[in-house]
């Protein structure tokens, strides 16, 4: 519930309340109490009574106020989060922002509420990158808010576009385009729109992935049908070869410390996961159980990986601690693919 002070349009408070409610419902972790079910409508701590929420089975309650700051349209939004079971206020804050950015302010508040309750960073102000193929001859590289709003078209082509990957600072996107007849990797600056092509010698260049420190891209370069893993330095624009094997090496993914890469290779006769140190180029096989292990990714702590695990025609999402040889399957279905993890 967000109240308003005199001189402020009432719909600002309503919009913030609705935006926060929508955000908190986005991932299915929370349920909201409708306004019609509430026993009271507090806009300050002095009006807040824990009993009114406890009897309704509410765990947390958020209240706030919207105040006008100046004639330029700036607003001061204050908010408080209460833990009903513990009967204490666990979060409060203020944000000054433009009335034209109510939605953005609501996302910041939602992030703080989410982190206070769950201990995880909120991701409501993050963005999506994706490719739209609206008809047979048009491909568009797009970005939008996490809820699909505020879509922007970055690039349009008559040829296929694929594999977008964000830079860590969210200022650039790397992707693959076939606009010149072959698979080619481009890096596009989101602010200026400028595009740089990675000049690799291979016939096919694919699977670009930014390192967490933003200094390099891991990518796959294919010479005469033999894909290998390469590093591309953002600073000096040089390519360094990491793998050199007659088997297929593909699907690179970085460790959180930017020192290692996990990749898929069929060098053993079936797709399995390997890890390589980007400095020493030492390689280590990570998976042995099952006849198919691919699409590996590190957990944020770097101690475990998750991937697609296949055995006897069933493909499931699995996890494995790097310190252990055992695999734990997370899903019970048979055609699972392409796991990824949220920014938090």
Regions from the PLM with identified roles:
Residues 45-112:
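Amphipathic beta-strand/beta-sheet edge segments enriched in Tyr/Trp
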Residues 85, 145-149, 189-193, 233-237, ...:
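Short loop/turn segments that connect beta-strands within beta-propeller blades
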Residues 122-124, 168-169, 212-213, 256-257, ...:
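Residue-level detector of Asp-centered blade-edge/turn motifs that repeat once per structural unit
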Residues 128, 170-174, 214-218, 261-262, ...:
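Hydrophobic beta-strand positions that form the internal "hydrophobic ladder"
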Residues 150-155, 194-199, 238-243, 282-287, ...:
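A short beta-strand motif characteristic of beta-propeller blades
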């Amino acid at each position: 519930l967000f109240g308003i002070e005199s001189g402020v349009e009432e719909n600002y408070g309503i919009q913030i309340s609705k935006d926060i409610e929508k955000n908190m419902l986005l991932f299915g972790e929370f349920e909201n109490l409708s306004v019609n079910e509430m026993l009271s409508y507090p806009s300050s701590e002095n009006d807040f009574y824990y009993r009114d929420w406890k009897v309704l089975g509410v765990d947390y309650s958020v209240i706030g106020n919207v105040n006008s700051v100046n004639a330029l349209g700036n607003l001061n939004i204050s908010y408080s989060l209460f833990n009903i079971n513990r009967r204490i206020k666990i979060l409060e804050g203020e944000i000054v922002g433009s009335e034209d950015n109510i939605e953005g302010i609501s996302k910041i508040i939602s992030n703080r509420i989410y982190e206070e309750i769950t201990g995880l960073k909120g991701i409501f102000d993050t963005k999506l990158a994706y490719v739209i193929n609206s008809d047979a001859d048009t491909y568009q590289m797009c970005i939008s808010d996490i809820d699909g709003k505020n879509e922007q078209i970055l690039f349009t082509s008559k040829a296929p576009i694929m594999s977008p990957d964000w830079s860590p600072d969210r200022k650039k996107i790397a992707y693959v385009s076939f606009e010149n007849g072959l698979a080619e990797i481009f890096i596009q600056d989101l602010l200026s729109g400028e595009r740089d092509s990675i000049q690799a010698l291979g016939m096919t260049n694919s699977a670009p992935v930014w390192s967490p420190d933003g200094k390099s891209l891991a990518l796959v370069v294919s010479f005469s049908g033999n894909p290998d893993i390469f590093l591309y330095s953002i600073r000096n624009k040089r390519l360094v070869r990491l793998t050199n094997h007659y088997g297929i090496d593909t699907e690179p993914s970085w460790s959180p410390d930017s020192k290692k890469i996990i990749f898929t290779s069929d060098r053993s006769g079936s797709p399995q996961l390997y890890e390589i140190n980007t400095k020493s180029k030492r390689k280590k096989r990570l998976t042995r159980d099952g006849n198919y292990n691919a699409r590996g990714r590190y957990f944020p702590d770097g101690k475990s990986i998750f991937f697609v695990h296949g055995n006897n025609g069933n493909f499931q999402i699995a996890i494995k601690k790097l310190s252990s040889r055992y695999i734990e399957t997370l899903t019970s279905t048979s055609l699972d693919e392409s796991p990824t993890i949220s920014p938090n």
